[in-house]
């Protein structure tokens, strides 16, 4: 068996599909670009097909789309309030892009774009930049009250304000790392169990019971990874709503 077949890291390698350069800048179209584009196309295609007819008695596909719409709307309303609903399109797009990217990664030989920190980090930075812009537009300099607990004595201000600033600056780091680490670790484990199963089967009949156990664990891990794919999209979206709520109501802190 080729060593590459058992290498759990090889699946994350970014490869060029189309070599493109703009002067000294490499703008090649890679497998990461392709699968991100595929995710966008699938999201648009799914909701376009589901809502094409807009029947009063919804079809199964339309029902799923409406459930997704209602789920995100309820999430935004509960975490960011009625005022946060103006950001529903952003949170909706973010959730389903991450969800479809995670699910695409579960297809054999597909590429998991969310297992790369450059992708999850870019998404996290987009969220935090939006939070800062919204906070400044909504509250002006009052946005900085977010870092100063109201009603606290001066010594507490001196201690807590730097902590609050560091905590805020760490948000994009933790937001991006959480998604990246979960997807990376999960796919490494899937690859290892699959590789062990094949290796044990090839080692002889005596190892068949152990291979069967490894296969069963791999199947269970696959089911868990589908759950993680949805859960991580939800966590990313709900934290986005929480951060937007902080920006919208900074003067309440």
Swiss-Prot record:
Positions of disulphide bridges: none
Q: Is this entry keyworded Transport?
A: yes
Membrane topology is: Multi-pass membrane protein
Its keywords, alphabetically, are: ATP synthesis, Cell inner membrane, Cell membrane, CF(0), Hydrogen ion transport, Ion transport, Membrane, Transmembrane, Transmembrane helix, Transport
Query: Cellular component GO terms, alphabetically?
Result: plasma membrane; proton-transporting ATP synthase complex
PROSITE patterns listed in its UniProt record: ATPASE_A
Q: Which residues form a coiled coil?
A: none
The record ties this protein, via SUPFAM superfamilies, to:
F1F0 ATP synthase subunit A
Classification via InterPro entries: ATP_synth_F0_asu, ATP_synth_F0_asu_AS, ATP_synth_F0_asu_bact/mt, F0_ATP_A_sf
Q: What GO molecular function annotations does the UniProt record carry, in alphabetical order?
A: proton-transporting ATP synthase activity, rotational mechanism
Name its cellular compartments: Cell inner membrane
Q: So where does this one cross the membrane?
A: 27-47, 87-107, 117-137, 146-166, 196-216, 224-244
* Subunit and interaction comment: F-type ATPases have 2 components, CF(1) - the catalytic core - and CF(0) - the membrane proton channel. CF(1) has five subunits: alpha(3), beta(3), gamma(1), delta(1), epsilon(1). CF(0) has three main subunits: a(1), b(2) and c(9-12). The alpha and beta chains form an alternating ring which encloses part of the gamma chain. CF(1) is attached to CF(0) by a central stalk formed by the gamma and epsilon chains, while a peripheral stalk is formed by the delta and b chains.
Write down the HAMAP family for this protein, in alphabetical order. Answer: ATP_synth_a_bact (MF_01393)
Which family is this sequence assigned to?
Belongs to the ATPase A chain family.
State its role. Key component of the proton channel; it plays a direct role in the translocation of protons across the membrane.
Protein name as catalogued: ATP synthase subunit a
Phylogenetic classification of the source organism: Bacteria, Pseudomonadati, Pseudomonadota, Alphaproteobacteria, Hyphomonadales
Gene giving rise to this polypeptide: atpB
């Amino acid at each position: 068996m080729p060593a590459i077949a058992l290498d759990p890291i090889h699946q994350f390698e970014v490869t060029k599909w189309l070599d493109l350069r703009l002067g000294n800048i490499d703008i090649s179209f890679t497998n990461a670009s392709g699968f991100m584009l595929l995710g966008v196309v699938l999201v648009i295609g799914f909701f376009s097909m589901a809502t094409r007819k807009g029947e009063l008695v919804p079809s199964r596909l339309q029902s799923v789309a409406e459930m997704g719409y209602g789920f995100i709307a309820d999430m935004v309303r509960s975490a960011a309030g009625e005022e946060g609903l103006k950001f529903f399109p952003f949170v909706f797009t973010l959730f389903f892009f991450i969800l479809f990217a995670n699910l695409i990664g579960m297809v054999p030989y597909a590429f998991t774009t969310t297992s790369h920190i450059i992708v999850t980090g870019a998404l996290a930075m987009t969220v935090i930049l939006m939070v800062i812009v919204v906070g400044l537009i909504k509250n002006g300099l009052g946005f900085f009250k977010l870092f100063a607990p109201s009603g606290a004595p001066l010594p507490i201000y001196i201690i807590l304000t730097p902590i609050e600033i560091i905590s805020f600056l760490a948000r994009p780091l933790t937001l991006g790392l959480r998604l990246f680490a979960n997807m990376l670790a999960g796919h490494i484990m899937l690859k290892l169990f699959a590789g062990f199963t094949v290796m044990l089967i090839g080692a002889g009949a005596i190892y068949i019971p152990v291979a069967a156990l490894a296969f069963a664990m791999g199947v269970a891990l696959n089911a868990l990874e589908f759950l993680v794919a949805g859960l991580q999209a939800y966590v990313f979206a709900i934290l986005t709503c929480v951060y937007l709520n902080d920006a919208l109501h900074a003067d309440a802190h």
